Amino acid sequence: MQLRLLTAALLLSSTALYAQTVEVSKAWVRATVPGQQATGAFMHITSRNGGKLVGVSSPAAGVMEVHQMKMEGDVMKMRAAPVLDLPAGQTVQLKPGGYHVMMMDLKQPMEKGSHVPLTLHLQDAKGLDSTLELSVPVRTLAPSATASPADAQSGHGAHKH
């Protein structure tokens, strides 16, 4: 019995360690206008050891998907990306016109100055899953290059594993 408890504790601590090797910065959600049912969330994600973003969830939206926008000829196309690779030591930018998180079936308007809870669902190179809880500010535009680190930081709330 003690061996099973120890094994479970080690497994939980290993997923906690993975989530701690993922850093999120410059996160923001685009504000909406009345009646708008979808918006985007944007951020920079850096994984020290590599892994994958396998999903995103939030109580603020009924559907959350990672999407990629890409030019095909002279037409901009948007497609769902079920998994987003997070190469070791590299920063992956989720930004307007590229990879981003689509928030659809919004439960309420996204008002400038408010914060939205987001949960990143991550997977390490060994296939272990973890989550990273964020509180993301709502803005009308992308954060400026001169924004203070506190303005650009999304926060790393409590991790749930």
Each language-model region and where it sits:
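Compact, glycine-rich, soluble single-domain proteins
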Residues: T21-H161
